[in-house]
Protein backbone atom coordinates (compact mmCIF):
# COMPACT_ATOMS: atom_id res chain seq x y z
CA UNK A 1 0.00 0.00 0.00
CA UNK A 2 1.03 3.63 -0.42
CA UNK A 3 1.25 4.01 3.33
CA UNK A 4 3.91 1.35 3.72
CA UNK A 5 5.82 2.65 0.68
CA UNK A 6 5.85 6.12 2.19
CA UNK A 7 6.95 4.70 5.51
CA UNK A 8 9.81 2.82 3.80
CA UNK A 9 10.88 5.98 1.99
CA UNK A 10 10.76 7.83 5.29
CA UNK A 11 12.98 5.21 6.90
CA UNK A 12 15.52 5.64 4.12
CA UNK A 13 15.59 9.44 4.39
CA UNK A 14 15.83 9.15 8.17
CA UNK A 15 19.44 8.00 7.83
CA UNK A 16 20.47 11.04 5.85
CA UNK A 17 18.55 13.90 7.41
CA UNK A 18 20.15 15.73 10.30
CA UNK A 19 16.79 16.96 11.58
CA UNK A 20 15.55 13.39 11.79
CA UNK A 21 18.71 12.18 13.55
CA UNK A 22 18.23 14.88 16.18
CA UNK A 23 14.66 13.70 16.66
CA UNK A 24 15.85 10.12 17.25
CA UNK A 25 18.54 11.16 19.72
CA UNK A 26 16.26 13.12 22.03
CA UNK A 27 13.37 10.67 21.86
CA UNK A 28 14.94 7.53 23.32
CA UNK A 29 12.63 7.55 26.34
CA UNK A 30 9.05 6.48 25.54
CA UNK A 31 6.81 9.53 25.64
CA UNK A 32 3.38 10.71 24.54
CA UNK A 33 2.55 13.98 22.80
CA UNK A 34 -1.08 15.14 22.99
CA UNK A 35 -2.13 17.00 19.84
CA UNK A 36 -5.60 18.59 19.98
CA UNK A 37 -6.35 20.75 16.93
CA UNK A 38 -9.17 21.86 14.62
CA UNK A 39 -9.25 21.18 10.81
CA UNK A 40 -10.68 17.64 10.73
CA UNK A 41 -10.54 17.81 6.92
CA UNK A 42 -6.81 17.02 7.25
CA UNK A 43 -7.28 14.11 9.68
CA UNK A 44 -6.24 11.42 7.18
CA UNK A 45 -3.19 13.37 6.01
CA UNK A 46 -2.06 14.08 9.59
CA UNK A 47 -2.58 10.40 10.41
CA UNK A 48 -0.09 9.57 7.62
CA UNK A 49 2.33 12.22 8.93
CA UNK A 50 2.20 10.72 12.42
CA UNK A 51 2.76 7.20 11.02
CA UNK A 52 5.80 8.43 9.11
CA UNK A 53 7.21 10.10 12.23
CA UNK A 54 6.84 6.81 14.13
CA UNK A 55 9.48 5.38 11.76
CA UNK A 56 11.85 8.19 12.76
CA UNK A 57 11.09 8.38 16.49
CA UNK A 58 9.64 4.97 17.44
CA UNK A 59 9.47 5.85 21.13
CA UNK A 60 7.22 8.86 20.55
CA UNK A 61 3.47 8.28 20.49
CA UNK A 62 1.39 11.18 19.18
CA UNK A 63 -2.18 11.09 20.48
CA UNK A 64 -4.08 13.09 17.88
CA UNK A 65 -7.58 14.46 18.40
CA UNK A 66 -9.48 16.82 16.10
CA UNK A 67 -12.85 18.59 15.97
CA UNK A 68 -14.28 21.59 14.11
CA UNK A 69 -17.48 22.31 16.02
CA UNK A 70 -16.95 24.24 19.23
CA UNK A 71 -13.15 23.83 19.06
CA UNK A 72 -12.42 27.23 20.72
CA UNK A 73 -14.86 26.42 23.56
CA UNK A 74 -13.39 22.94 24.12
CA UNK A 75 -9.83 24.30 24.05
CA UNK A 76 -10.64 27.05 26.57
CA UNK A 77 -12.19 24.44 28.89
CA UNK A 78 -8.95 22.41 28.72
CA UNK A 79 -6.77 25.48 29.35
CA UNK A 80 -8.92 26.57 32.29
CA UNK A 81 -8.63 23.13 33.89
CA UNK A 82 -4.84 23.11 33.42
CA UNK A 83 -4.91 20.36 30.75
CA UNK A 84 -2.96 22.28 28.11
CA UNK A 85 -2.42 20.06 25.02
CA UNK A 86 1.22 19.79 23.87
CA UNK A 87 0.06 20.99 20.43
CA UNK A 88 -3.12 23.06 20.06
CA UNK A 89 -4.53 25.35 17.40
CA UNK A 90 -6.06 28.79 16.99
CA UNK A 91 -6.53 31.23 14.18
CA UNK A 92 -3.39 33.24 13.41
CA UNK A 93 -3.05 36.99 13.91
CA UNK A 94 -5.11 38.32 16.83
CA UNK A 95 -5.49 34.91 18.49
CA UNK A 96 -1.69 34.56 18.62
CA UNK A 97 -1.85 37.17 21.40
CA UNK A 98 -4.92 35.55 23.00
CA UNK A 99 -2.95 32.29 23.49
CA UNK A 100 0.54 33.77 23.79
CA UNK A 101 0.85 33.04 27.53
CA UNK A 102 0.57 29.30 26.77
CA UNK A 103 2.71 29.27 23.61
CA UNK A 104 6.39 28.49 23.10
CA UNK A 105 8.25 31.06 20.98
CA UNK A 106 9.62 29.06 18.04
CA UNK A 107 11.95 31.86 16.89
CA UNK A 108 15.39 30.33 16.35
CA UNK A 109 14.03 26.82 15.73
CA UNK A 110 15.13 25.14 12.44
CA UNK A 111 11.54 25.26 11.15
CA UNK A 112 11.69 29.06 10.88
CA UNK A 113 14.32 28.67 8.14
CA UNK A 114 11.83 26.92 5.85
CA UNK A 115 8.62 28.77 6.82
CA UNK A 116 7.40 31.08 4.05
CA UNK A 117 7.59 34.82 4.78
CA UNK A 118 3.80 35.30 4.34
CA UNK A 119 3.11 32.57 6.91
CA UNK A 120 5.82 33.79 9.33
CA UNK A 121 4.20 37.25 9.34
CA UNK A 122 0.91 35.75 10.59
CA UNK A 123 2.67 33.82 13.39
CA UNK A 124 4.11 36.93 15.08
CA UNK A 125 2.47 38.67 18.01
CA UNK A 126 0.36 41.42 16.37
CA UNK A 127 0.74 43.50 19.55
CA UNK A 128 4.50 43.95 19.18
CA UNK A 129 5.49 42.14 15.95
CA UNK A 130 7.78 39.76 17.82
CA UNK A 131 8.36 36.02 17.89
CA UNK A 132 7.00 33.01 16.06
CA UNK A 133 4.23 31.49 18.13
CA UNK A 134 3.07 28.73 15.83
CA UNK A 135 3.33 26.86 12.57
CA UNK A 136 0.73 26.45 9.82
CA UNK A 137 -0.66 23.23 8.38
CA UNK A 138 -1.14 25.15 5.17
CA UNK A 139 -0.83 28.39 3.37
CA UNK A 140 -4.09 29.21 1.62
CA UNK A 141 -5.86 30.94 -1.21
CA UNK A 142 -9.28 32.52 -0.82
CA UNK A 143 -11.42 33.65 -3.74
CA UNK A 144 -14.22 32.61 -6.08
CA UNK A 145 -13.97 29.11 -7.52
CA UNK A 146 -15.77 28.87 -10.88
CA UNK A 147 -16.58 26.44 -13.69
CA UNK A 148 -14.71 27.53 -16.84
CA UNK A 149 -16.90 25.41 -19.14
CA UNK A 150 -20.12 27.09 -17.93
CA UNK A 151 -18.55 30.54 -18.35
CA UNK A 152 -17.49 29.65 -21.90
CA UNK A 153 -20.93 28.27 -22.77
CA UNK A 154 -22.49 31.54 -21.57
CA UNK A 155 -20.10 33.63 -23.66
CA UNK A 156 -18.24 35.05 -20.65
CA UNK A 157 -14.70 35.32 -21.97
CA UNK A 158 -13.00 36.83 -18.93
CA UNK A 159 -13.70 36.65 -15.22
CA UNK A 160 -16.12 39.42 -14.12
CA UNK A 161 -13.77 41.48 -11.99
CA UNK A 162 -15.99 44.52 -11.35
CA UNK A 163 -19.32 44.81 -9.52
CA UNK A 164 -21.26 45.62 -12.72
CA UNK A 165 -19.53 42.88 -14.76
CA UNK A 166 -20.54 40.33 -12.09
CA UNK A 167 -24.20 41.39 -12.30
CA UNK A 168 -24.12 40.97 -16.10
CA UNK A 169 -22.44 37.56 -15.77
CA UNK A 170 -25.13 36.37 -13.32
CA UNK A 171 -27.88 37.33 -15.78
CA UNK A 172 -26.18 35.41 -18.60
CA UNK A 173 -25.51 32.31 -16.48
CA UNK A 174 -29.06 32.30 -15.13
CA UNK A 175 -30.52 32.68 -18.65
CA UNK A 176 -28.52 29.60 -19.73
CA UNK A 177 -30.25 27.52 -17.03
CA UNK A 178 -27.50 27.35 -14.39
CA UNK A 179 -27.39 28.72 -10.86
CA UNK A 180 -24.75 31.48 -10.92
CA UNK A 181 -23.81 30.82 -7.25
CA UNK A 182 -23.78 28.17 -4.59
CA UNK A 183 -23.25 30.01 -1.33
CA UNK A 184 -22.87 27.81 1.76
CA UNK A 185 -24.67 30.48 3.80
CA UNK A 186 -25.52 27.86 6.44
CA UNK A 187 -21.85 28.02 7.58
CA UNK A 188 -20.89 31.01 9.77
CA UNK A 189 -17.29 31.05 8.49
CA UNK A 190 -18.31 31.50 4.84
CA UNK A 191 -19.23 35.13 5.61
CA UNK A 192 -15.79 36.04 6.99
CA UNK A 193 -14.16 34.54 3.89
CA UNK A 194 -16.36 36.63 1.55
CA UNK A 195 -16.36 39.85 3.59
CA UNK A 196 -12.58 40.11 3.97
CA UNK A 197 -12.24 40.96 0.25
CA UNK A 198 -14.57 43.95 0.74
CA UNK A 199 -12.83 45.04 3.96
CA UNK A 200 -9.49 45.00 2.10
CA UNK A 201 -10.90 47.26 -0.63
CA UNK A 202 -12.48 49.59 1.96
CA UNK A 203 -9.15 49.93 3.76
CA UNK A 204 -7.13 50.42 0.56
CA UNK A 205 -9.49 53.13 -0.73
CA UNK A 206 -9.36 54.91 2.63
CA UNK A 207 -5.55 54.84 2.54
CA UNK A 208 -5.21 52.68 5.67
CA UNK A 209 -4.23 49.05 6.34
CA UNK A 210 -6.83 46.33 6.91
CA UNK A 211 -5.49 45.98 10.48
CA UNK A 212 -6.13 49.70 11.12
CA UNK A 213 -9.66 49.41 9.74
CA UNK A 214 -10.41 46.44 12.00
CA UNK A 215 -9.07 48.30 15.01
CA UNK A 216 -11.43 51.20 14.15
CA UNK A 217 -14.39 48.82 14.39
CA UNK A 218 -13.04 47.32 17.62
CA UNK A 219 -12.80 50.70 19.33
CA UNK A 220 -16.07 52.01 17.93
CA UNK A 221 -14.68 54.82 15.76
CA UNK A 222 -15.46 53.15 12.39
CA UNK A 223 -18.97 52.81 10.94
CA UNK A 224 -19.98 50.49 8.07
CA UNK A 225 -21.78 53.41 6.40
CA UNK A 226 -18.46 55.33 6.18
CA UNK A 227 -17.27 52.79 3.60
CA UNK A 228 -19.26 52.33 0.35
CA UNK A 229 -17.28 49.13 -0.31
CA UNK A 230 -18.98 47.67 2.78
CA UNK A 231 -22.33 49.49 3.09
CA UNK A 232 -23.14 49.27 -0.63
CA UNK A 233 -20.93 46.72 -2.36
CA UNK A 234 -20.71 43.97 0.27
CA UNK A 235 -24.42 43.97 1.08
CA UNK A 236 -25.30 44.23 -2.64
CA UNK A 237 -23.07 41.21 -3.29
CA UNK A 238 -24.81 39.20 -0.55
CA UNK A 239 -28.19 40.21 -2.08
CA UNK A 240 -26.95 39.16 -5.53
CA UNK A 241 -25.76 35.80 -4.16
CA UNK A 242 -29.13 35.17 -2.48
CA UNK A 243 -31.03 36.15 -5.66
CA UNK A 244 -28.88 33.99 -7.93
CA UNK A 245 -27.89 31.27 -5.46
CA UNK A 246 -29.21 28.15 -3.75
CA UNK A 247 -32.97 27.67 -3.37
CA UNK A 248 -32.51 27.44 0.41
CA UNK A 249 -29.35 29.49 1.09
CA UNK A 250 -29.49 29.20 4.88
CA UNK A 251 -29.74 25.41 4.63
CA UNK A 252 -26.82 24.97 2.21
CA UNK A 253 -23.57 23.97 3.95
CA UNK A 254 -20.11 23.12 2.60
CA UNK A 255 -21.11 19.66 1.31
CA UNK A 256 -24.11 21.19 -0.50
CA UNK A 257 -21.83 23.70 -2.20
CA UNK A 258 -19.39 21.01 -3.30
CA UNK A 259 -22.25 18.93 -4.66
CA UNK A 260 -23.95 21.81 -6.55
CA UNK A 261 -20.63 22.83 -8.10
CA UNK A 262 -19.26 19.33 -8.74
CA UNK A 263 -22.43 18.21 -10.52
CA UNK A 264 -22.41 21.28 -12.80
CA UNK A 265 -25.56 22.92 -11.42
CA UNK A 266 -23.81 26.06 -10.10
CA UNK A 267 -21.19 28.16 -11.88
CA UNK A 268 -19.45 29.76 -8.86
CA UNK A 269 -18.70 28.75 -5.27
CA UNK A 270 -18.59 31.39 -2.52
CA UNK A 271 -16.63 31.46 0.73
CA UNK A 272 -14.26 28.64 -0.18
CA UNK A 273 -10.75 28.15 -1.54
CA UNK A 274 -8.05 25.61 -2.27
CA UNK A 275 -9.39 23.12 0.28
CA UNK A 276 -12.51 22.10 -1.76
CA UNK A 277 -10.76 20.95 -4.93
CA UNK A 278 -10.15 17.30 -3.98
CA UNK A 279 -13.82 16.83 -2.99
CA UNK A 280 -15.04 18.50 -6.19
CA UNK A 281 -12.75 16.32 -8.35
CA UNK A 282 -14.09 13.21 -6.63
CA UNK A 283 -17.56 14.20 -7.97
CA UNK A 284 -16.33 15.15 -11.47
CA UNK A 285 -12.67 14.45 -12.28
CA UNK A 286 -13.00 16.38 -15.58
CA UNK A 287 -14.45 19.62 -14.22
CA UNK A 288 -12.62 22.70 -15.55
CA UNK A 289 -11.88 24.71 -12.43
CA UNK A 290 -11.18 28.44 -12.54
CA UNK A 291 -10.19 30.68 -9.64
CA UNK A 292 -10.18 34.45 -9.09
CA UNK A 293 -10.82 37.18 -6.54
CA UNK A 294 -14.11 38.89 -5.65
CA UNK A 295 -15.32 41.89 -7.66
CA UNK A 296 -15.45 44.45 -4.84
CA UNK A 297 -15.60 47.79 -6.71
CA UNK A 298 -15.65 49.09 -10.30
CA UNK A 299 -11.83 48.94 -10.25
CA UNK A 300 -10.87 45.56 -11.75
CA UNK A 301 -7.40 45.75 -10.16
CA UNK A 302 -9.04 45.37 -6.71
CA UNK A 303 -10.41 41.94 -7.67
CA UNK A 304 -7.57 39.98 -6.05
CA UNK A 305 -7.16 36.57 -4.49
CA UNK A 306 -6.14 36.50 -0.83
CA UNK A 307 -3.22 34.39 0.41
CA UNK A 308 -1.65 33.54 3.75
CA UNK A 309 -2.30 31.24 6.68
CA UNK A 310 -5.35 31.70 8.86
CA UNK A 311 -4.49 28.93 11.30
CA UNK A 312 -1.70 28.40 13.78
CA UNK A 313 -0.51 25.30 15.65
CA UNK A 314 0.99 26.26 19.01
CA UNK A 315 3.43 24.33 21.20
CA UNK A 316 2.61 24.42 24.92
CA UNK A 317 5.58 26.26 26.48
CA UNK A 318 5.17 24.31 29.73
CA UNK A 319 4.82 20.90 28.06
CA UNK A 320 6.36 17.98 29.98
CA UNK A 321 7.57 16.73 26.57
CA UNK A 322 8.65 20.10 25.17
CA UNK A 323 11.84 18.91 23.43
CA UNK A 324 10.12 15.93 21.81
CA UNK A 325 7.28 18.17 20.62
CA UNK A 326 9.77 20.66 19.13
CA UNK A 327 11.61 17.76 17.45
CA UNK A 328 8.36 16.66 15.80
CA UNK A 329 7.47 20.18 14.62
CA UNK A 330 11.00 20.75 13.25
CA UNK A 331 10.93 17.39 11.46
CA UNK A 332 7.56 18.28 9.90
CA UNK A 333 8.95 21.52 8.40
CA UNK A 334 12.51 20.45 7.55
CA UNK A 335 12.63 16.72 6.64
CA UNK A 336 12.22 15.52 3.05
CA UNK A 337 9.04 13.65 3.94
CA UNK A 338 7.60 16.54 5.96
CA UNK A 339 8.26 19.10 3.22
CA UNK A 340 6.74 16.87 0.53
CA UNK A 341 3.72 16.06 2.75
CA UNK A 342 2.07 19.44 2.12
CA UNK A 343 1.65 18.91 -1.63
CA UNK A 344 1.79 15.11 -1.95
CA UNK A 345 -0.35 14.00 0.99
CA UNK A 346 -2.38 16.97 2.25
CA UNK A 347 -2.76 18.65 -1.15
CA UNK A 348 -2.47 22.14 0.36
CA UNK A 349 -0.65 25.37 -0.41
CA UNK A 350 2.74 24.72 1.24
CA UNK A 351 3.37 27.06 4.22
CA UNK A 352 7.08 26.57 3.53
CA UNK A 353 9.42 27.93 0.86
CA UNK A 354 8.94 25.40 -1.92
CA UNK A 355 9.53 25.06 -5.65
CA UNK A 356 7.21 22.07 -5.88
CA UNK A 357 4.45 22.59 -8.46
CA UNK A 358 0.99 21.72 -7.13
CA UNK A 359 -1.37 19.44 -9.04
CA UNK A 360 -4.35 21.50 -7.88
CA UNK A 361 -5.79 24.12 -10.24
CA UNK A 362 -6.84 26.50 -7.46
CA UNK A 363 -3.31 26.56 -6.06
CA UNK A 364 -1.68 26.87 -9.51
CA UNK A 365 -4.00 29.71 -10.55
CA UNK A 366 -3.68 31.31 -7.10
CA UNK A 367 0.12 31.29 -7.49
CA UNK A 368 -0.14 32.88 -10.95
CA UNK A 369 -2.67 35.54 -9.89
CA UNK A 370 -0.73 36.44 -6.73
CA UNK A 371 2.43 36.83 -8.85
CA UNK A 372 0.78 38.86 -11.63
CA UNK A 373 -1.90 40.91 -9.83
CA UNK A 374 -0.76 40.74 -6.20
CA UNK A 375 -2.72 39.18 -3.33
CA UNK A 376 -4.91 41.12 -0.92
CA UNK A 377 -4.45 41.05 2.86
CA UNK A 378 -5.69 38.11 4.95
CA UNK A 379 -8.00 40.45 6.87
CA UNK A 380 -9.74 37.72 8.89
CA UNK A 381 -6.68 37.15 11.09
CA UNK A 382 -7.08 40.55 12.77
CA UNK A 383 -10.24 39.30 14.53
CA UNK A 384 -11.11 36.32 16.72
CA UNK A 385 -13.35 33.47 15.65
CA UNK A 386 -15.69 34.42 18.52
CA UNK A 387 -16.37 37.62 16.59
CA UNK A 388 -16.46 35.91 13.18
CA UNK A 389 -19.09 33.46 14.38
CA UNK A 390 -21.28 36.33 15.64
CA UNK A 391 -20.75 38.19 12.35
CA UNK A 392 -21.93 35.09 10.45
CA UNK A 393 -25.02 34.86 12.64
CA UNK A 394 -25.86 38.55 12.04
CA UNK A 395 -25.55 38.03 8.27
CA UNK A 396 -27.79 34.94 8.51
CA UNK A 397 -30.43 37.09 10.25
CA UNK A 398 -30.08 39.64 7.43
CA UNK A 399 -30.58 36.96 4.76
CA UNK A 400 -33.56 35.53 6.68
CA UNK A 401 -35.15 39.00 6.66
CA UNK A 402 -35.06 39.35 10.46
CA UNK A 403 -32.73 42.37 10.20
CA UNK A 404 -32.63 45.06 7.52
CA UNK A 405 -29.29 46.42 6.31
CA UNK A 406 -29.09 49.25 8.86
CA UNK A 407 -30.11 46.87 11.65
CA UNK A 408 -27.39 44.44 10.58
CA UNK A 409 -24.79 47.26 10.46
CA UNK A 410 -25.78 48.44 13.95
CA UNK A 411 -25.42 44.88 15.30
CA UNK A 412 -22.05 44.42 13.56
CA UNK A 413 -20.69 47.66 15.05
CA UNK A 414 -22.03 46.96 18.56
CA UNK A 415 -21.00 43.30 18.82
CA UNK A 416 -17.57 43.79 17.22
CA UNK A 417 -16.72 46.33 19.91
CA UNK A 418 -18.12 44.13 22.69
CA UNK A 419 -16.42 40.89 21.59
CA UNK A 420 -13.03 41.95 20.20
CA UNK A 421 -12.75 45.53 21.46
CA UNK A 422 -12.48 44.22 25.00
CA UNK A 423 -9.62 41.80 24.19
Q: What is each of the regions a protein language model found here?
A:
Residues 36, 51, 77, 95, ...:
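Extracytoplasmic/periplasmic substrate-binding proteins
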Residues 172, 214-250:
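Glycine-centered hinge/linker elements that transmit conformational signals in sensory
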Residues 52-121, 149-161, 260, 267-268, ...:
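Extracytoplasmic "Venus flytrap"/periplasmic binding protein-like
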Residues 152, 322, 339, 371-423:
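Conserved C-terminal helix/tail region of periplasmic/extracytoplasmic solute-binding proteins
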Residues 28-40, 60-65, 87, 133, ...:
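Short, well-ordered beta-strand elements
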Residues 55-56, 61, 81, 130, ...:
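Extracytoplasmic/periplasmic substrate-recognition and gating elements
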Residues 99-101, 121-159, 185-218, 302, ...:
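Periplasmic solute-binding protein
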Residues 21, 91-143, 167, 193-194, ...:
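Hinge/lid segment of periplasmic solute-binding proteins
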Amino acid sequence: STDSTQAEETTETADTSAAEETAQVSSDEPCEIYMFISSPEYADAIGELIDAYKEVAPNVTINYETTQNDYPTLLKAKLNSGEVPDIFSSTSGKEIDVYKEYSYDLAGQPLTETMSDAVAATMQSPADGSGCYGIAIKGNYFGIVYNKAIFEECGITEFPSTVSAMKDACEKISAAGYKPFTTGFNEWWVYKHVAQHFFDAAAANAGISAAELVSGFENGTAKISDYPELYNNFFDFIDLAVKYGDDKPLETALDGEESAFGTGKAAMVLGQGAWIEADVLSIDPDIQIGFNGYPVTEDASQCQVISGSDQSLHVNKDSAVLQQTLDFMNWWYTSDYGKAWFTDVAGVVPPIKSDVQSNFEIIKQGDELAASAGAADLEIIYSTDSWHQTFGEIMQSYIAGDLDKDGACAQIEKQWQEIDGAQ
